[in-house]
Amino acid sequence: AKIFSDIGWHSTVIEGGYKSYRKAVLGDLDYLPAKFRLIVLSGPTGTAKTHILRLAAESGLQVLDLERLANHRGSLLGSEPGSLQPAQRLFESRLCATLQNFSPDRPIFIEAESNKIGQIHVPSALWASMRQANRVSLTAPIDARIAFLQRDYRHIIEQPDHLIELLTGLCQRYSTATFDLWKTTIKARDWHGFVHNLLKTHYDPS
């Protein structure tokens, strides 16, 4: 802090150091979610939930974008190209700072997520509030969802070998015949057929 002050930067010292800061973050994450009225945007994969929420944020609504904070889209294929997820503690610090900037007088819109986004765990108090919140459910025709996913995941489609490698994470859940079908459609560049089968087999039943 002294060095920063010497060069003209404003700085403060946290009494108790990092342990004190960390305790404050965890304390805030325990009680802050209950202060807010959450509205959860849900719907099947491919209904553009994340895009809708980001447009809502641009229009001035309060939006808690967990996928952006976690740098992950929240599914097997959700890792962002060329970047890593933050450490759990960094995610929690960013989440805490975001919640502190919200007004309890206005609702917070948030996407339906599992309690784990990639390797990041959603804090239990926030997860409990999400489960109890009112929901807005999106729907879209299957062909519209397929077309959207082909555009939104173009970075994966352009790397078919990497896509097949990612899908090996599902090998234990599905039959060899199913996995072979996925590989066949990928190698044939039949993206409509591949996405349709993946939705029907993996995403929609869950």
Regions found by a protein language model. Name each.
Residues 1-20, 24:
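Thiolate-centered catalytic microenvironments shared by cysteine-dependent enzyme domains
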Residues 2, 120-123, 150:
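Short amphipathic alpha-helical segments
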Residues 12, 39-41, 62-64, 110, ...:
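Hydrophobic/aromatic beta-strand patches that form the interior of the parallel beta-sheet core
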Residues 21-26, 73-78, 145-148:
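Short, charged, surface-exposed secondary-structure boundary motifs
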Residues 29-36:
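Phosphate-binding P-loop
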Residues 37-58:
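Glycine-rich phosphate-binding P-loop
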Residues 58-129:
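Conserved nucleotide-sensing/catalytic segment adjacent to the nucleotide-binding pocket
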Residues 128-135, 139-206:
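Conserved NTP phosphate-binding and transfer environment spanning the P-loop NTPase/kinase superfamily
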